[in-house]
């Protein structure tokens, strides 16, 4: 498959990120590497979406702190960003709602075809720009080669990086604004783009807990969007999926990353990180990046069991 016929993917991870760990970042990297190796996908971006404060989880520190820690954790990444939309809503949002928000938003700001897993575009190729006279923001006068889908969407991201949402005292975060004026950005209507939910096997297993998830939401998440699962602690994902009728029904929409099952980051968790911080355990440097640790110590977070 050529670059233009592959499905372009944005990986979206929802969660508490309380705090965000090296394991979370490695989850993105492992998922991207795995999808690229299949030869069917090009991952063009990753989104970290921390949960709203009203989620009510014990020990959950405020979104103000969690957003800043997430931003510090991805500051050196050229493809993963933090999106505060979920935190800035009036109340907690379901995972399904967050996925739908980003799907609808990307439709508006990129002009791309965003396909459901079960209804892929029949012509996943780059179309013609609507405005052939405008100077595209991706154009390099010294390199007049044809732009690729990934380059186009990458430059859309650069344009949007100037659009920030500011809510004092939270620092500035770049995110996609549905009211953004993209200026001379060319819109290509026939790039097949999907937003996939990225998660660990623990979230997948939670789908099997009766009453925890709304079944209609599960149908949309797994049936329409699709999931990329990065197993933790050598979890048996086949066994997990067999315990849910919806997961069995849409098993072809669930991609399990099969790389090194003994990956050192697969055992890292936010819970272990909080415990290490509370006990002064030096192993915390194995779990969290140094900028995140520095911020936690400066802000005196997770000092006691209540967060």
UniProtKB/Swiss-Prot annotation:
Disulfide bonding pattern of the chain: none
InterPro entries: Cyt_trans-like, Euk_NMN_adenylyltrnsfrase, NMNAT_euk, Rossmann-like_a/b/a_fold
PANTHER family reported for this sequence: NICOTINAMIDE MONONUCLEOTIDE ADENYLYLTRANSFERASE (PTHR12039), NICOTINAMIDE_NICOTINIC ACID MONONUCLEOTIDE ADENYLYLTRANSFERASE 2 (PTHR12039:SF18)
Pfam families: CTP_transf_like (PF01467)
Keyword tags: ATP-binding, Cell projection, Cytoplasm, Cytoplasmic vesicle, Golgi apparatus, Lipoprotein, Membrane, NAD, Nucleotide-binding, Nucleotidyltransferase, Palmitate, Pyridine nucleotide biosynthesis, Transferase, Ubl conjugation
Membrane-protein topology: Lipid-anchor
Family recorded in the similarity comment: Belongs to the eukaryotic NMN adenylyltransferase family.
A single GO cellular-component term on record: Golgi apparatus
Cofactor note: Divalent metal cations. Mg(2+) confers the highest activity.
Entry function: Nicotinamide/nicotinate-nucleotide adenylyltransferase that acts as an axon maintenance factor. Axon survival factor required for the maintenance of healthy axons: acts by delaying Wallerian axon degeneration, an evolutionarily conserved process that drives the loss of damaged axons. Catalyzes the formation of NAD(+) from nicotinamide mononucleotide (NMN) and ATP. Can also use the deamidated form; nicotinic acid mononucleotide (NaMN) as substrate but with a lower efficiency. Cannot use triazofurin monophosphate (TrMP) as substrate. Also catalyzes the reverse reaction, i.e.
Binding locations of ATP: 24, 271-274
Top EC class for this record: transferase
Protein name: Nicotinamide/nicotinic acid mononucleotide adenylyltransferase 2
Protein EC: 2.7.7.1, 2.7.7.18
Quaternary structure note: Monomer.
Activity regulation, short description: Inhibited by P1-(adenosine-5')-P3-(nicotinamide-riboside-5')-triphosphate (Np3AD) and P1-(adenosine-5')-P4-(nicotinamide-riboside-5')-tetraphosphate (Np4AD).
Binding site for NAD(+): 16-17, 92, 95, 200, 202, 212-213, 232
Cofactor(s) needed for function: Mg(2+)
Compartment(s) of residence: Golgi apparatus membrane; Cytoplasmic vesicle membrane; Cytoplasm; Cell projection, Axon
Protein origin, superkingdom: Eukaryota
A GO MF term: nicotinamide-nucleotide adenylyltransferase activity
Catalytically driven reaction(s): beta-nicotinamide D-ribonucleotide + ATP + H(+) = diphosphate + NAD(+); nicotinate beta-D-ribonucleotide + ATP + H(+) = deamido-NAD(+) + diphosphate
Any GO BP: NAD biosynthetic process
Lipid tethering residues (S-palmitoyl cysteine): 164-165
Post-translational modification as stated in the protein's UniProt record: Degraded in response to injured neurite. Degradation is caused by polyubiquitination by MYCBP2 after recognition by FBXO45. Palmitoylated; palmitoylation is required for membrane association.
Pathway assigned to this chain's UniProt record: Cofactor biosynthesis; NAD(+) biosynthesis; NAD(+) from nicotinamide D-ribonucleotide: step 1/1; Cofactor biosynthesis; NAD(+) biosynthesis; deamido-NAD(+) from nicotinate D-ribonucleotide: step 1/1
């Amino acid at each position: 498959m050529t670059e233009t016929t592959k499905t372009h993917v944005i990986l979206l991870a929802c969660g508490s990120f309380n705090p965000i760990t090296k394991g979370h970042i490695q989850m993105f990297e492992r998922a991207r590497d795995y999808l690229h190796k299949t030869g069917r996908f090009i991952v063009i971006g990753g989104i970290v979406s921390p949960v709203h404060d009203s989620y009510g989880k014990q020990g959950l520190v405020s979104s103000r702190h969690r957003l800043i820690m997430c931003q510090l954790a991805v500051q050196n990444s050229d493809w993963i960003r933090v999106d505060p939309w979920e935190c800035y809503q009036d109340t907690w949002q379901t995972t399904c709602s967050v996925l739908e928000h980003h799907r609808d938003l990307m439709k508006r700001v990129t002009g791309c075809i965003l396909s459901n897993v079960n209804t892929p575009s029949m012509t996943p190729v780059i179309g013609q720009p609507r405005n052939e006279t405008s100077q595209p923001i991706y154009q390099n006068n010294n390199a007049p080669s044809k732009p690729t889908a990934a380059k186009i969407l990458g430059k859309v991201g650069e344009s949007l990086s100037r659009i920030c949402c500011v809510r004092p005292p939270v620092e500035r975060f770049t995110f996609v604004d549905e009211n953004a004026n993209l200026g001379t950005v060319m819109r290509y209507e026939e790039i097949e783009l999907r937003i996939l939910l990225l998660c660990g096997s623990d979230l997948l297993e939670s789908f099997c807990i009766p009453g925890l998830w709304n079944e209609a939401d599960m149908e949309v998440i797994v049936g329409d969007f699709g999931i990329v699962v990065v197993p933790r602690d050598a979890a048996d994902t086949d066994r997990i999926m067999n315990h849910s009728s919806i997961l069995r029904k849409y098993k072809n929409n669930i991609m399990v990353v099969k790389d090194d099952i003994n990956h050192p980051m697969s055992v890292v968790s936010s819970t272990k990180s909080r415990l290490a911080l509370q006990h002064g355990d030096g192993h915390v440097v194995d779990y969290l990046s140094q900028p995140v640790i520095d911020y936690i110590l400066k802000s005196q977070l997770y000092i006691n069991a209540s967060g």
